[in-house]
Amino acid sequence: MARVTVEDCIDKVDNRFELVLLAAHRARMISSGAQITVDRDNDKNPVVALREIADEHVGPEDLKEDLIHSLQKYTEVDEPEPEAVPMIASGDSSGGEDSDVMLDRMTEEELLAGLQGLVPPEHTDDDEG
């Protein structure tokens, strides 16, 4: 089979720069163990990637999406919108009602049980006088 050049693939991807980026990304995928969809014919990975694009075994849009995803340093995760943050901020400035905010509180029985568990001091200055 004749060698594939960029001109053979330009009808699949209009921009030559984008074609080279996509073929290089596909070649890296092949190097890392991705399944080849055409016969290798003793060709190197970039040529195999160009042949896959030319024969439309691999879609340019899929490659482009995968390339963009691989280059992203931050992947966007859908999270609930922060509606609670303005409510907390407005609660602090409205006079500080404690009824909505429940902090670490002890009941009277828990406090008495904790005090009974304390060991009294052996000797204090108040005991002598």
From Swiss-Prot:
Residues 76-100 are annotated as: Disordered. GO terms for biological process: DNA-templated transcription. Its EC number is 2.7.7.6. GO terms for cellular component: DNA-directed RNA polymerase complex. It catalyses: RNA(n) + a ribonucleoside 5'-triphosphate = RNA(n+1) + diphosphate. Keywords: DNA-directed RNA polymerase, Nucleotidyltransferase, Transcription, Transferase. Gene3D superfamilies: 3.90.940.10. GO terms for molecular function: DNA binding; DNA-directed RNA polymerase activity. It comes from the Bacteria. Promotes RNA polymerase assembly. Latches the N- and C-terminal regions of the beta' subunit thereby facilitating its interaction with the beta and alpha subunits. The RNAP catalytic core consists of 2 alpha, 1 beta, 1 beta' and 1 omega subunit. When a sigma factor is associated with the core the holoenzyme is formed, which can initiate transcription. NCBIfam families: rpoZ. Belongs to the RNA polymerase subunit omega family. This is DNA-directed RNA polymerase subunit omega. It comes from Xanthobacter autotrophicus (strain ATCC BAA-1158 / Py2).
